[in-house]
Regions:
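Acidic/His/Gly-enriched intrinsically disordered linker/tail segments
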Residues: 331-336
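Alpha-helical transmembrane segments
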Residues: 337-341
Length: 420
């Protein structure tokens, strides 16, 4: 591998991949826009009677606005990445840190913090426009400027704390534990992530939202009956004040082991019936009972293990980092640059992970169908689609590449086939 790393012109490859990624994804988004335009004059047959003409037109305008903004943000992100790397901004930050400390561990923390702050500042206009222009324009935004700023600072502090611990741990291991450091680093990061995942529902999520026990007996009784039927034990049923920020609805469960919690958006409880809620929850429980979470964890471990091995090899090559605009070649600057550019080398895996995710969504629907009423599954999905102004006519290539969930029409058709 070292011969390949030393002889390859990564500058050309890097720029080419950024260009290919942007052009491919822009092409798919334009296809999606055309699909929306082609179907704008008539409500899709399956949604007749579910959405009104006015609601359908609003969803069309909303999705067109979002896709156009996504094209802009993709271009913006590509330009920023090039400025960070080949433009020398990352190297400039690395040189500031090198002049400040000779400690690799402290350097990793300082450079990671600088990178995080710069990225946060750059992303602010994007977040503001998305929240206070697009979401506001279409009636979904409930976020106040105070909540927005508070969320931003909370997120920054939490990200800074977690990333500093991870970066310091990894760099300490790299410097002190010899050639097989990547095995120990992989294990350490896995343990840290497991701890974070365990603590997330009880320490981090409450910093952003209020969680109150579900006390609505009309919803609570059928849900508890379903939990008993599928033998699922949780820490409790909670309602999250999602309406503080948005009118979008959702339900999910978080944590693992004794910290498993089922969470419902308060916005969801206002729009669906208890029977529909039971069917939606049946889907979420399906992911757990069918081992999807365990399988995702195992695949993450495998890819993480491979990723750390590749990192261990790449760190030995100055050429890789010089070709990405880094001249201040410390172990921590190399590590963080690798983290920064890795996405450009792995984006092609997205359609495969999306396809696997959609397969598991169908399986979770099948699980829910076994334990709940299929008719209520359909009506619940249709309501969620309507309330979230989902794209009812997505382009097939676009959805194949991007969608982690099958289009609503496909999920409904699958359930209807089982009802026959």
């Amino acid at each position: 591998m070292q011969e390949f790393l030393a002889s390859t012109n990564f500058t050309v490859i890097f720029i080419s991949l950024i260009g290919i990624k942007f052009l491919l994804e822009t092409y798919l988004k334009i296809r999606n826009l055309k699909s929306i335009e082609l179907n704008k004059n008539a409500i899709p047959e399956r949604f007749v009677g579910v959405v009104t003409e006015e609601e359908y037109k609003k969803s069309i305008v909303y999705n067109i606005d979002r896709i156009r903004f996504q094209i802009f943000t993709a271009l913006f992100g590509a330009v920023v990445l090039i400025i960070f790397t080949l433009g020398g901004l990352f190297n400039f930050l690395a040189e500031i840190v090198v002049s400040t400390t000779s400690s690799d561990v402290l350097g990793a923390v300082l450079l990671g913090l600088l990178l995080l702050i710069v990225e946060q500042v750059i992303s602010i206009p994007i977040s503001i426009y998305s929240t206070f222009v697009i979401e506001e324009r279409h009636g979904f935004n409930k976020t106040t400027s105070k909540t927005f700023v508070t969320d931003m600072f909370k997120s920054l502090i939490i990200s800074a704390t977690i990333s500093s611990i991870i970066y310091a741990t990894v760099i300490y291991i790299v410097v002190n534990l010899g050639d097989n450091w990547w095995i120990y680093a992989f294990g350490a990061v896995f343990i840290l992530q497991a701890i974070i995942f365990f603590l997330y529902p009880v320490l981090i999520m409450p910093l952003f939202n209020k969680f109150e026990p579900l006390d609505n007996e009309e919803f609570k009784k059928p849900i508890e009956k379903l939990l008993k039927k599928v033998d699922f034990k949780s820490k409790g049923l909670f309602v999250m004040n999602a309406s503080l920020r948005s009118t979008h609805g959702n339900a999910f469960f978080t944590g693992f082991g004794k910290n498993k919690r089922i969470v419902f958006f308060d916005t969801l409880l206002k729009t669906i019936t208890p029977d529909e809620m039971e069917a939606i929850l049946g889907h979420e429980l399906g992911h757990y009972k069918l081992g999807h979470i365990r399988k995702t964890l195992i695949s993450s471990l495998v890819f993480g293990f491979i990723g750390f091995y590749i990192l261990s090899e790449v760190l030995k090559s100055d050429n890789f980092f010089l070709d990405h605009g880094l001249e201040s070649l410390t172990v921590y600057s190399k590590f963080l640059l690798f983290y920064l550019v890795a996405g450009s080398y792995t984006f092609f895996t997205k359609p495969f992970t999306s396809a696997l995710s959609r397969k598991r969504e169908f399986e979770a629907d099948d699980f829910s169908f076994q334990y709940t009423n299929g008719e209520y599954m359909i009506s619940g999905l249709l309501k969620l689609s309507k309330d979230n102004a989902s794209n009812l006519t997505p382009d097939s290539l676009y959805s194949s590449y991007y969608y982690s969930h099958p289009p609503i029409a496909e999920r409904v058709a699958s359930i209807e086939n089982k009802l026959k």
